């Protein structure tokens, strides 16, 4: 292990295998706090490479609790958090709407990073159990088209890094790992990142990790597809990556100010999204979810973004998406 420390302190990059070896030791609790802090800061200052991020993700996936992976096509829709916008839970709402559109979503998430209420805070407010077993979650995915995998339940090794992360009070590699370590190992993913500089590196990381098709997005300061500004996209499709920009108009949607997506505490967000998913919500909220669902549906081969957004809006207005929420809560 010492030779890897020396390599990092010389500002040299690790190979994917070296990174996997190092992070396997981290999740086993084999590094003391000062060593872990030194590793994370040296990587942050130099800038983590896609190979290093992929190696770290593979170490955490190897250490994760088993999830019975289905043989059908399914996706994750998840953001890094940490964008500081305190918006409503767009990706969580999008998962339920996408399921209502007929695709399968195994959403990996955690408690809040950037907003006052992360995806699991919101789901708990809806009465959805966070400690559902892997088998129960798989059945929900089969039957309802949506399940939620609570990160701390599957990634117990994360706890070894938590005290150091809290003391450092700065973003580290762990801030981008969350979306990459879904224990269900989805072949498709829509991943939002907190910085435009991360869009291409995370897409390159997804390629290394073997994703079939994925899109990494950052829109006007948000780790989502934006409806107030252009969205930067890096799309991975069978090994090749294409970078492009999307505007709300590409989805056939109007623009809305970022302030229109302001969220609140978990109970407030629950009420906002309950109204939205029952077809009684704000038009800006519906548009934001429709844009994200539209890009997710594209990963399934539905290439027409305007058509996809319209399909999502129709599903939102029908109130069918909320039926998935109540059905998932009823499985508690």
UniProtKB/Swiss-Prot annotation:
GO molecular function, one term: magnesium ion binding
Cofactor annotation comment: Binds 2 magnesium ions per monomer.
UniProt: anthranilate 1 binding residues: 79, 110
Pathway: Amino-acid biosynthesis; L-tryptophan biosynthesis; L-tryptophan from chorismate: step 2/5
Gene Ontology process terms (BP): L-tryptophan biosynthetic process
Binding-site list for 5-phospho-alpha-D-ribose 1-diphosphate: 79, 82-83, 87, 89-92, 107-115, 119
Cofactors, names only: Mg(2+)
EC number(s) recorded for this UniProt protein: 2.4.2.18
Superkingdom as given in the UniProt entry: Bacteria
Binding site for anthranilate 2: 165
Residues reported to bind Mg(2+) 1: 91, 224
Binding-site residues for Mg(2+) 2, renumbered to this chain: 223-224
GO cellular component: cytosol
Keywords: Amino-acid biosynthesis, Aromatic amino acid biosynthesis, Glycosyltransferase, Magnesium, Metal-binding, Transferase, Tryptophan biosynthesis
Function of the molecule: Catalyzes the transfer of the phosphoribosyl group of 5-phosphorylribose-1-pyrophosphate (PRPP) to anthranilate to yield N-(5'-phosphoribosyl)-anthranilate (PRA).
Similarity comment: Belongs to the anthranilate phosphoribosyltransferase family.
Oligomeric form and interacting partners: Homodimer.
Record-given protein name: Anthranilate phosphoribosyltransferase
């Amino acid at each position: 292990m010492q030779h890897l420390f020396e390599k990092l302190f010389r500002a040299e990059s690790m190979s994917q295998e070296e990174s996997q070896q190092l992070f396997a030791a981290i999740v086993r609790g084999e590094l003391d706090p000062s060593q872990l802090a030194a590793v994370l800061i040296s990587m942050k200052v130099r800038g983590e490479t896609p190979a290093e991020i992929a190696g770290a993700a593979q170490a955490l996936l190897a250490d994760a609790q088993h999830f019975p992976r289905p043989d059908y096509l399914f996706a994750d829709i998840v953001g890094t958090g940490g964008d500081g916008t305190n918006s409503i839970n767009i990706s969580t709402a999008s998962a339920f709407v996408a399921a209502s559109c007929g695709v399968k979503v195994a959403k990996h998430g955690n408690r809040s990073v950037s907003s006052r209420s992360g995806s699991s805070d919101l789901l708990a407010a809806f009465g959805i159990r966070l400690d559902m077993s892997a088998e129960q979650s798989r059945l929900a995915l089969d039957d309802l088209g949506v399940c939620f995998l609570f990160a701390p339940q599957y990634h117990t090794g994360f706890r070894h890094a938590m005290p150091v992360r809290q003391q450092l009070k700065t973003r580290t590699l762990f801030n981008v790992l969350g979306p990459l370590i879904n224990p269900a190992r989805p072949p498709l993913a829509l991943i939002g990142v907190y910085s435009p500089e991360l869009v291409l590196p995370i897409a390159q990381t997804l390629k290394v990790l073997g994703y079939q098709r994925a899109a990494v997005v950052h829109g006007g300061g948000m780790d989502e597809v934006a409806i107030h500004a252009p969205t930067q996209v890096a799309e991975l499709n069978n090994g090749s990556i294409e970078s492009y920009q999307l505007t709300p108009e590409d989805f056939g949607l109007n623009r809305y100010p970022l302030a229109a997506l302001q969220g609140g505490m978990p109970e407030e967000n629950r009420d906002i999204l309950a109204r939205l998913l029952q077809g009684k919500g704000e038009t800006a909220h519906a548009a934001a979810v429709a844009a994200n669902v539209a890009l997710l549906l594209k990963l399934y081969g539905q290439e027409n973004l305007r058509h996809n957004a319209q399909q999502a809006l129709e599903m939102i207005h029908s109130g069918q998406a909320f039926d998935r929420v109540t059905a998932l809560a009823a499985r508690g």
